[in-house]
Structure formats: structure tokens, C-alpha cells
Amino acid sequence: MEIFQVGGSIRDELLGIKPNDKDWVVVGSTPEEMEANGFKAIGKDFPVFLHPKTKEAYALARTEKKSGVGYKGFTFYFDPSITLEEDLQRRDLTINAMAKDNKGKIIDPFNGKKDLEQEILKHTSPAFLEDPLRAIRLARFKTYGHLHNFKIAKETQNMLNKIASTDELSTLSAERIWMEVHKALNRENSDNFFKILVEFNLTDPWFTNLKKVSSDGSEPRYKWAEIQRVNNFKLAKNLPVPNEFKKTTEIIKKTLDFIAATSLQD
């Protein structure tokens, strides 16, 4: 059994940012061995375990194969023979496909560190195209304060355009889309999320009426209300928007309608 720290926490550490949490991959182990060592199984689709003390997530190394539509249309394979590099290859971006061993050595088979230094967002493999959620996640990464100036690699732009040309985005659940939107709204550069959707025609079917982007607002619900306002309050009718967001948007809409009506009377 070998344990490696992986993913976004490595990226953030290399940028001098303390990660909020850490993810771990276990190579050469089995579910039975993990549970025998006190780990608690929590994964439904693939083996993920909680550390008995830190409660951090530890996943067995795995590969995945497209077997259906949408981000859930994958079959996962895991056994002790799967290597760390095989596990890293399934990750979305090169800057998220790095690992660190217990001696602090960085394992970087896809040159994520170089892309990090050059401020480039680049997909790890052609498998990026198989999961439409990766396009939405990439848009969200552009809202991060330490990533918002990163450029999207030309070849990755081509991937986004290909995803936009299919109907794969429609296979995503409304709940999953809103989760990404909500995460983006909680970031300082949330307008970048919507800019990417517009730039790469990723607006259908969830943001069909999205034409303009605004960065006004501090709290997520006010940001959402402002996005709605500049798009004539016609945006994302099929998303499970929380009531507090809806109420804030409705108050602003009624206020603007009242002002407009009063102006006409004058």
C-alpha cells in the first residue's frame, strides 16, 4: 500500500496557498485492507474511505471508461494493479493531476507544474471530452482568485467547443449544475464563470438566455440577482435556485418595475 496526496491541494501548495482540504489516493490496496486498517467506506460508485483520525477522504487508485451519457455515464475499475499515473490521467486538468509522496516528492507525469508556472489551464487527456461536467468545472476554476488570470490552452478550447456542439450538457442534472453555479457565486471572480459559458457557447440548455455578465454584488444571492437583472430576469428557469436567492431577485425585479411604472406616470 502506497499513499499519495493528490489533486487541487498540490496545485495550491505549489502556488503558496494553504489548501482547505487534502485528497489522497491509495495505490496497491483493496477495500478489505482499507477497512482492516480502520478506514470507513463512504463511496457508492467507487471505493472512497474516511481516515479513522483525520476524516480526510482516501480513494483507491482507479481508472474509468465511458459507458453512458453525462458525468455519471462511467464505469470505474479499481484493483491493486492500477498505478498512480493511471489514476492521475483520468483527472480533468494537468494542474490538478499532480501527486506528492510521503517524502514530499512531486509526481507530475503530465507537466502540471509547468502549466502552473505558465498560468495555463490544459486538459490532461482526450478523456476530458467524455465528461461534459468538466467544461462547467473549468469555468468555475476561472473564478478562483489564484487562477482567474490563467489562459485556457488552445487545444482545451477546442475541447470546450466540441462539448458545446453536442447535447451532452443536457444530460447533467439541474442539481449538479446549480452546485457549480453556487460555488462560482461564492468566489470573488464569479463573473468569469458566466463569461466562459458565453464565450464557448456552453449556455444551452441551462443558461439559454445568458447574454450579458455582471460582476456587481458581494453576497452570492445579490450576484445572482444582478445576473438575472442584466438578462431581463429570464435566466436558468430550470435550476433548483434556493428560495433566498429567488426572493432577493424578486424584490429587485419588483422594485425596478415600480420605478419604471412611476417614471411613466411622471
Q: Where are the regions a protein language model picked out?
A:
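Catalytic cores of the polymerase beta-like nucleotidyltransferase superfamily
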Residues: 1-266
